[in-house]
Amino acid sequence: MAHTGQKLGRYTLHESINEGGMSEIWLATDEAGRPFAVRVMKNNTAFAFAERKRFNSGAEILQACQDGQFIIGYVEHGKLGDDQVLVLEYVEGSNLKLLMAAGDPVLTDDIARVLIDFTTAMEVVHDRGFMHLDIKPENVLLSRNGSLRLVDFDLAQPIPNPPRKLDRLSGTPHYMAPEQLLKQPVDHRVDIWAWGVSAYELLTFKKPFPGENADEVLRRQANRREFVRPRDVNADIPAELERIILKCLEQDMNRRYPITSVLVHELKQALYV
């Protein structure tokens, strides 16, 4: 296990700042004292084939999606000593899920810019030929100066053409599209659905399809009689923005936005940005 003061190549670990099932993220500095976020894989035994493949695949896709603005900065990945690591830019800030929980004013004062930057980050991923497959507020960092970064590419895959079934069901059910939960063929439009769920949540502080498990979420998606439109929760939401969100949340993926650039364009028009 990684520990405070441990040296991994040119990096010294200082403080654990986040932890997930597969890895732990540390604040680290290099020999020049510059800060980085170092993600250390927990289970790096000789038999952790699947975990290592997923870790490295996510790192490679992240590297391919670098844009210098909306995607978390990639530095390097590989084995340092006995540990499998991914070194990233360090962003001093918080994710959108935590900002929602804290009732941070940025989600009211600057929500238009947050939504547009969030969508633009997703557009970058799709333009590079990948689907993220884990779009949600928790995977979007907002720095103290307001810059946004999309993170966590562990589940990302190349966009299939035509759509195909995923090998396994991974992700967070509340943000999964119906075709995902039903284990039907998918493509990048599952990300567009997840963005719609996230936008609804950021604007209303409620989930559009609440449920204790995947089956309940799926039932709510299919039975729209219980669905509450965003403007019925927050009357300040512009009608055109509501229309965009509802288009992202179409049950039939063919009725959602076909490409993310159209979503970005319409969103900018709706928000006058």
Each model region followed by its residue ranges:
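Activation segment signature within eukaryotic-like protein kinase domains
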Residues: 114-115
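AlphaC helix of the eukaryotic protein kinase fold
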Residues: 45-64
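Conserved short submotifs of the Hanks-type protein kinase catalytic core
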Residues: 81-95, 99
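Protein kinase catalytic-loop region centered on the HRD/HxD motif
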Residues: 120-130
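Structural helix C-cap motif within protein kinase domains
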Residues: 204-208
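Activation-segment/catalytic-loop signature of the eukaryotic protein kinase fold
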Residues: 77
